[in-house]
Amino acid sequence: YPHGSAQPQKVRDGSVILMDCGCAVHGYESDISRSWVFGEPSPKQRKVWNTVKRGQEIALETAKIDVPVGSIDDAVRKYYEKEGWGPGYRLPGLSHRTGHGIGLDGHEPPYLVHGDATPLQAGMCFSDEPGLYIPGEFGIRLEDCWFMTASGPKLFTPLAKSLENPI
C-alpha cells in the first residue's frame, strides 16, 4: 500500500483494481489513477470509493489563489478523520500526500502535504489523489491533474463519475 503488490495477484469477483498511469506530451508529464471493483462491489468498497471521490472534490473546493498548498491536504484529512480514517497519515487512511506538483517531472514541488506553505498561484499544475487504504483488504485512489487559474482550479481530465463508471 498504496502502490500495489510486488507479488502476482489473481483478479477475483470483488477484487479492487487500481490503475495508476500517465503519459508525456512535449516533455510534460501527466498522472491519473482510477479504482473499480471486478464484479459486484461490497457496501464497504462502495462507501470507501464515495469517500475518496468526496475527498477529491474537497481538495478542488479548497484550492484558491494565495492559499497555502498544504491547507488542501489539511482539508481532505479533516474530512477523512470525520469519517473515521487516520488520524493524520495513519492507516487505515491516507498514508501519502493529497497531491503533488506536476509538469516536467511526474512528481515535483510544491506538494499538497501538511506544512507546505507555498501559496497557490495561477499557472501551477497538480495531481489530486487523496486515496484511502485498508491494509490486508483494499485501497481506493482516484487521481486527476488540474491547473490553477485566477478564477479557481480547472481539470485537465473529467473526474470519475461513479464506481461503476470510473473512466
Give names to the regions the model predicted:
Residues Y1-I167:
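Active-site neighborhoods and metal-handling regions in enzymes and metal-associated proteins
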